[in-house]
Structure formats: C-alpha cells, structure tokens
C-alpha cells in the first residue's frame, strides 16, 4: 500500500504547493498527483528520463517526509491522539464559556441580590406555575391541552366518587340482607313455639270438648290458681265456733225455737252471706260460674 502511494505521488507538485500558496490553492488536491504521460511520448526520450530523476532538494524533502511518516506511529503512541486532542480542545472551550457566564451571573447577582433571594425562597408550586405560564402562554393549543387535563381530572374524580357510592350501597344492602335473614329466623322460631303451645293445649283438652273454642296457655294456667285462692279465702272466712254462754240469764227456749222455726236471719248472718256473695262474684271463671251453696253455712249459724 505504501509503495503504490509513493509511486503515484508527484514530489514536484508537492514541493511547488509548499513554495507557492497561490499555486496550491489553484491546483487543489488534484495537483498532488502526477498526470498520466501522453501516449505519443517516447519512453526513452532524455526529457522524460531527466524529469524522472529527483533533484537533491527533492531527495531531502522525500527523506524528511519518510522520517516523519516513520516517527508518526511511536509519537502517537507516546503522545496524545487526534481524538483526545480535539476532545480536550472542545472541553476547554466549554469551560471557558461557563466561566464567562458565571462571571456575568455574579455581576448581575451583586446588582440584584434581593431578587435572587426571593427566587430561592419561592415555593415549588409557584415555580411550576411560572414555568407553565412561560411555556404555554396564550397559545390555543396550550389552552386546549389544559382544558383536556382539567376534564380528565374531573372525570377521574367523578369515577372515584361513583366507586365510593357504589361501595357504600353494597355495604348497606349486605347489612339489610343479614337483618332480614335474622328477622326471618326469629319469625320461624316464634311460629314453632306457637305451634308447640297449641299442640300442648289440644292434648290437655278433655274428651268431647269443642275444638273450635281455643284457650290461651295463660288462661289455662291461671284458672287453677284462682280456684285455689277462692277455696283458701272461704276457709279463712268460716266463723269460729262460739264459746259457752256464761251469762246467768238463760235464753228463752221459746225465742230460740221461734227464730229457728220462722227462719229469720240475724245481722251477723246477713253480713257473712253478703261478704261471701261479693267474694264469689269476684272469683267467677270465664267458662262457668261458680255457684255458692249457703245452706250449710246457715245451719252452722243457727246451731251457734
């Protein structure tokens, strides 16, 4: 590759380009390579041979170029490469620009320090609003975007409210269903208890009694108690047997016999009979009336 490059290289044109800048600008890159010799030129002409022989100055330039090319590889390995050089150059230029901007900002900050402090104390919301106002401005597209964002937010909030409302309704419906289920169970229990009481009443009913007339359990239980209370009260109200009369004046047998024959009642007997009648009226049953036979009491009172 290097041999072909040196064969095609025209040293005369290269040296001419170094000596004359105008000639180099006019010829350009095409002047670096030697034009092909004409076909009619003789191969063994003295002019062609003399032109092909390099001069001493050309030999020195050629040797210098060869030395430069030979030393390019080690120099690149030891020194800094082209890419690193350009990167460092760009970085240095950027740092210089940043330093200049920093100096300008420091100068501006010294003149307007209060405004800088206010900007530092500003809240993030205010900064965000300022940025949005600067970016959006009064552009119709920005207004449309803001409106769409507001509509989207409102729709999202409405959906959340709807979800919460539906959730509350579901909770209430579940509670009401549980309450209805509990009440239905209580109703079934009451119906079963009522049926059991009715069966017990029918079982205790005497043979031949009418099944159309049904009595409650409370009345069936209270009637025997009332009858027992009536019997005890009658026994307690029985007159105490009288003591023998110690009065020396004996009663006339005629008067006693007359009262017995005529059947007249004394005041004590009348009061006892009225008391028993009143008590019997109060203790009457619902199915049948309790009749009071006062015959034995009259005989006991007459005997006294």
UniProtKB/Swiss-Prot annotation:
Gene behind this protein: BZIP50
Regulation: Transcriptionally activated by IRE1 in response to endoplasmic reticulum (ER) stress. IRE1 cleaves a 20-bp fragment causing a frameshift of the mRNA transcript, leading to a nuclear isoform of the BZIP50 activator.
Skewed-composition ranges (Acidic residues): 127-139
Positions in the Cytoplasmic compartment: 1-222
UniProt name for this protein: bZIP transcription factor 50
Organism listed in the record: Oryza sativa subsp. japonica
Gene Ontology molecular functions: DNA binding; DNA-binding transcription factor activity
Region (Leucine-zipper): 169-183
Biased composition (Basic and acidic residues): 150-163
């Amino acid at each position: 590759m290097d041999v072909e490059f040196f064969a095609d290289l025209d040293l005369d044109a290269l040296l001419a380009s170094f000596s004359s800048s105008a000639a180099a600008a006019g010829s350009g890159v095409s002047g670096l390579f030697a034009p092909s010799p004409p076909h009619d030129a003789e191969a063994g002409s003295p002019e062609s041979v003399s032109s092909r022989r390099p001069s001493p100055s050309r030999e020195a330039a050629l040797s210098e170029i060869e030395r430069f090319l030979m030393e390019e590889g080690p120099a690149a390995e030891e020194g800094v490469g082209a890419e690193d050089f350009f990167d460092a150059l760009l970085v240095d230029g950027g740092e210089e620009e940043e330093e200049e901007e920093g100096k300008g900002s420091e100068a501006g900050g010294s003149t307007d320090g209060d405004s800088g402090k206010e900007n530092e104390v500003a809240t993030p919301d205010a900064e965000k609003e300022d940025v949005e106002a600067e970016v959006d401005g009064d552009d119709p597209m920005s207004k449309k975007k803001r409106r769409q964002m507001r509509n989207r937010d409102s729709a999202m909030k409405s959906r959340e409210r709807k979800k919460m409302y539906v959730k509350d309704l579901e909770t209430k419906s579940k509670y009401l269903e549980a309450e209805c289920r509990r009440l239905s169970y209580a109703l079934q229990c009451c119906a079963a208890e009522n049926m059991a009481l009715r069966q017990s009443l029918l079982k205790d009913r005497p043979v031949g009694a009418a099944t159309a007339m049904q009595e409650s359990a409370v009345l069936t239980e209270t009637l025997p108690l009332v009858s027992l209370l009536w019997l005890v009260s009658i026994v307690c109200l029985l007159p105490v047997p009288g003591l023998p009369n110690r009065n020396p004046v004996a009663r006339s047998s005629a008067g006693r016999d007359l009262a017995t024959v005529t059947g007249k009642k004394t005041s004590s007997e009348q009061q006892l009979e009225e008391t028993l009648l009143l008590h019997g009226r109060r203790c009457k049953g619902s199915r049948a009336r309790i009749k009071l036979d006062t015959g034995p009491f009259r005989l006991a009172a007459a005997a006294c």
